[in-house]
Amino acid sequence: VNLACNKLAGMIEHNVLSHSNELQDYLAGLLAPYKNTGIQAIVLGCTHYVFIKEDIKEAFGEDVLIFDGNRGTVNRLKSVLEEKGIKRPSDAGKGAVILNSSSDDQFSMKTYSKLFYGK
């Protein structure tokens, strides 16, 4: 079953975080038609969804298996960087650059910082 979740990535990007009523209501409505139909696993098709994996599991049912492709994406990125000879310079120091497809406003940057780094 393919299920379009048109609003979900945007909700995550706009700080509708785990366990909020808005997120729970959206997921409940989205997943209700598929509960108790014999579906045993859900494959997350977006890198955003890993942040709400537990919410999806709770909305669908505790027994469902959840698979995400994030580890595979990271492994592939690492492989490509190694193939191209691209590595972090030893004198680069600490820090991060966040590139995204939405907005560069301060609210979004704070949201990403909270999602990725917990602060």
Where are these regions (language model features)?
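Non-catalytic structural scaffold of enzyme domains
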Residues: V1-K119
